[in-house]
From Swiss-Prot:
Recorded GO CC terms: plasma membrane
Chief location category: membrane
GO molecular function: transmembrane transporter activity
Transmembrane segments: 13-33, 34-54, 99-116, 139-159, 165-185, 214-234, 244-264, 289-309, 340-360, 365-385
Name of the protein in its database record: Multidrug resistance protein MdtH
Ribosomal protein keyword on record: no
Record's bilayer topology term: Multi-pass membrane protein
Organism, as annotated: Proteus mirabilis (strain HI4320)
UniProt entry tagged with the keyword Chaperone: no
UniProt similarity note: Belongs to the major facilitator superfamily. DHA1 family. MdtH (TC 2.A.1.2.21) subfamily.
NCBIfam families documented for this protein: PRK11646.1 (NF008650)
PANTHER family, A to Z: MULTIDRUG RESISTANCE PROTEIN MDTH, RESISTANCE PROTEIN MDTM, PUTATIVE-RELATED-RELATED
């Protein structure tokens, strides 16, 4: 028993270090894509939004297949291959001088994420006990925030010299992460049985409760992905310099490092998971409406603070709820399918956000995209409320 506990502990330390590399490599590049191609090169927002949405749709939409393959063959080969594919995508992005090259680089990056993301998420479930899972997700999210601000700082600094450097550094970090996994990650199996690919896919698709929950979250992700597209654009417009974007991620890091874990610990004692998810979504939705009429950098940072408070309230609950509902016989398949809401939400949020940004500029109605985003948030909130109240999920499944 002591050996099992030691293995779990070492595994969790490995996950934390691995997660830092993945987050750092991602945020060196992706927050700066909209600034590089929209603000610096003058491309239409819908072109860049389509690229980001395509990456989201491919990665998360195909995640169920990546998870099912990992159920069959184990986590390690999928993770290593996926990280090398993402590195290749970032290297190609450095050469993007036409939209199709940017789109292709995003597809390669997405296919990499399709392979490594579901098994990494399933490893979290495998290596954590149910009662500690919510807190471990909180630690990962705190780390995500720290990695985001460090990555954005590095990327913003490199962008002052050359966007090629931004992409090459991001690619190098993912190559390093692949080597790290090849060297240290044991050949874990992520499910309790060696589930055939077809059986794992069938098991999750027939779970109507889980499918409905995942698809309802599409609207949640339409809002959450705006930290990669619309928020950086509006901060850059108000500040007049792309270097201001790093302060947006600094706010997220500060809030996460100081409040995320205490909020998670306090709220898990007083509220159910679905209540925490809906409270966070409410804050995210209400923060959208004033963005388009704000012209002060301090005011926009206050609004972003409110948005991030919603995110750090909702995210640990959302992740824990998804894990609670997963069948342990097909963890990879379930965790892959759980990304489908992010796939649809990302595709709609990025492409639709870029299109609404262009339309708002043409009509001289900068508040239009933000009003529509806020409305989507409240529609999603209503849908979640109906879902949780029409058919209660078992209490045991809703407690971390």
């Amino acid at each position: 028993m002591a050996l099992v506990t030691q293995a779990r502990t070492l595994g969790k330390y490995f996950l934390l270090l691995d997660n830092m590399l993945v987050v750092l490599g991602f945020f060196v590049v992706f927050p700066l894509i909209s600034i590089r191609f929209v603000e610096q090169l003058g491309w239409a927002g819908v072109i860049v939004g389509f690229a980001l949405g395509l990456r989201q749709l491919v990665q998360q939409g195909l995640g169920i297949f990546g998870g099912a393959i990992a159920d069959r063959f184990g986590a390690k080969p999928m993770i290593i291959t996926g990280m090398l594919l993402r590195a290749l995508g970032f290297a190609l992005m450095a050469l993007a001088d036409k939209p199709w090259i940017l789109w292709l680089s995003c597809i390669l990056s997405a296919l990499g994420g399709t392979l490594f993301d579901p098994p990494r998420t399933a490893l979290v479930i495998k290596l954590t006990r149910p009662y500690e899972r919510g807190r471990f997700y909180s630690l990962l999210l705190m780390q995500d925030s720290a990695g985001a601000v460090i990555g954005a700082l590095i990327g913003s600094w490199l962008l002052l010299y050359d966007f090629h450097l931004v992409c090459w550094v991001g690619a190098g970090i993912f190559v390093l992460a692949a080597i790290f996994n090849a060297w240290l990650l044991p050949a874990y199996r992520i499910s309790t049985t060696r589930t055939p690919i077809k059986e794992g896919l069938k098991r999750v698709i027939l779970d109507k409760r889980f499918v409905q929950y995942v698809l309802t979250l599409t609207g949640y992700f339409v809002l959450s992905v705006q930290v990669m597209l619309m928020f950086p654009i509006v901060v850059n417009e108000i500040a007049g310099t792309p270097s201001a974007v790093k302060w947006m991620y600094a706010i997220e890091a500060l809030l996460s490092l100081t409040l995320l874990y205490p909020i998670a610990r306090w709220s898990e004692k007083h509220f159910r998971l679905e209540q925490r998810l809906m409270a966070g979504l409410f804050l995210m939705s209400i923060s959208m409406f004033p963005v388009g009429i704000t012209h002060s950098l301090h005011a926009i940072f206050l609004i972003i603070t409110l948005f991030y408070l919603g995110t750090i309230t909702a995210e640990p609950a959302r992740e824990t709820l998804s894990a609670s509902l997963a069948d342990p016989r097909a963890r990879g398949s379930y965790m892959g399918f759980s990304r489908l809401g992010l796939a649809f939400g990302g595709a709609i949020g990025y492409t639709g956000g870029g299109w609404m940004y262009d339309i708002g500029k043409q009509l001289e109605l900068p508040e239009l995209p933000w009003f529509l985003l806020g409305s989507i948030g409240f529609i999603t909130l209503y849908a979640l409320h109906r879902q949780f109240n029409r058919k209660k999920i078992e209490t045991a499944m809703l407690t971390p």
